Amino acid sequence: MRDLPLTSLALVLSALGALLGTEALRAEEPAVGTSGLIFREDLDWPPGSPQEPLCLVALGGDSNGSSSPLRVVGALSAYEQAFLGAVQRARWGPRDLATFGVCNTGDRQAALPSLRRLGAWLRDPGGQRLVVLHLEEVTWEPTPSLRFQEPPPGGAGPPELALLVLYPGPGPEVTVTRAGLPGAQSLCPSRDTRYLVLAVDRPAGAWRGSGLALTLQPRGEDSRLSTARLQALLFGDDHRCFTRMTPALLLLPRSEPAPLPAHGQLDTVPFPPPRPSAELEESPPSADPFLETLTRLVRALRVPPARASAPRLALDPDALAGFPQGLVNLSDPAALERLLDGEEPLLLLLRPTAATTGDPAPLHDPTSAPWATALARRVAAELQAAAAELRSLPGLPPATAPLLARLLALCPGGPGGLGDPLRALLLLKALQGLRVEWRGRDPRGPGRAQRSAGATAADGPCALRELSVDLRAERSVLIPETYQANNCQGVCGWPQSDRNPRYGNHVVLLLKMQVRGAALARPPCCVPTAYAGKLLISLSEERISAHHVPNMVATECGCR
């Protein structure tokens, strides 16, 4: 059993042990009973505290609340509980160094300072949480890669401390290197070693991609360890449960200031009133009636439904100059055609002299650009279509209709009209953005295609999003309880959606029709275009089986 790889047989035995209620303890470790567990009602919790998946564990003292319990996020097995108890009791003499496989203190030991910090924290947690992540997948070729569970929401930030804990078997002294570790680290297992610890400075790679890749080189040897020796060293045997002990990743998130409860009562201090800011004051009315009316329309329609007013965001031209920009020749009809083909936001900045003087220059002189008749007609047609669709949307403020009528009067948009053609383009882009936003506010509840077309505009273009699926409702599935299934969400709009190499000409034509204002019974929607399988361990007919289920994880998205 020592030389067997970590296959589905070992996973089945582990699941069977959990199913039968066996206790996964090493023979030399002290048994941990229920006296180390503390329930929520044993402590004073502040009112309104979130009900989070916390486990309160007391490593020392009794369980009546006299000692500070540990707030653990994740499943804390007997292995991790015994490890934390050993760190708490350690005084870092020669015996403790041998217990944790630490080499001579004269060598560079990245894990020893981290172990000391963890021990100091265990003696005074101060309400800080400890996140425990268990191994989810391991690959041995070409190098050992350990992929762990993804931390819960809010626990994926840069931690204050990250330790990879191994429960080793027999093996030589090794030097471990790889990305994610703060330099080379030495491990010196001996007969008295119960744990091996590696300090991790970039733990996010442990649950992304293939996981945390490790390169183990025996000290004093040129050859690398074989797979069998690696398995024996990294996955020690649990002789009681006839299985191997898998590593764990311990994260200590950075502490955040929080109010302290006092016997169920919470002292609160009101926030100071906001100070008046010059940036939030109303700007003086513009001397240009078109720009002034357009500003009033955008402000009227951009107010969120849940608030009566919203602060105005001041744009800093100097800061905007630092963003990636694309040069567009507004005198070129071909460039304007590209702008008309998409609904991406458009920002035009007036010259400083035009913005401060009382008589600003027009945005563009229609006689100085070779405007084609067909292009001007298209701008006028799309402008009228966008205005008509915006008027038909439900729930618009009463001021929308007169403001829109005034803008159309100030901006005829025709080739022979008195208005500036660039004003027509600016008004069209503004109406397109407002139309997309108000589509998402339709109380009639849009379907999937409608959600993809407008209701998810705040999410950006169609892309792969993280989605965790809970399998505990499926009683036949034992492992995993939850997994990352992913989902596709976002806007299907031209030209963003052609970034996926799997897009087809059919959806491109539909997107262009949608941009031109054509009514589609089913607009293009954001859906998965590629999937990956997942290994599931299930119980069927009183037997435990492991099988690979296809199409369980969405890996790519596109518009269809």
Curated annotation (Swiss-Prot):
Induction: Plasma AMH levels in polycystic ovary syndrome (PCOS) patients are two- to threefold higher than in women with normal ovaries. Residues 259-287 are annotated as: Disordered. It comes from the Eukaryota. The keyword Cytoplasm does not apply. One of its GO terms (cellular component) is extracellular region. Keywords: Differentiation, Disease variant, Disulfide bond, Glycoprotein, Gonadal differentiation, Growth factor, Pseudohermaphroditism, Secreted, Signal. Glycans are attached at N64, N329. It is found in: Secreted. Changing R472D: Little effect on AMH signaling. Gene3D superfamilies: Cystine-knot cytokines. Belongs to the TGF-beta family. Plays an important role in several reproductive functions. Induces Muellerian duct regression during male fetal sexual differentiation. Also plays a role in Leydig cell differentiation and function. In female acts as a negative regulator of the primordial to primary follicle transition and decreases FSH sensitivity of growing follicles. AMH signals by binding to a specific type-II receptor, AMHR2, that heterodimerizes with type-I receptors (ACVR1 and BMPR1A), and recruiting SMAD proteins that are translocated to the nucleus to regulate target gene expression. Homodimer; disulfide-linked. This is Muellerian-inhibiting factor. It comes from Homo sapiens (Human).
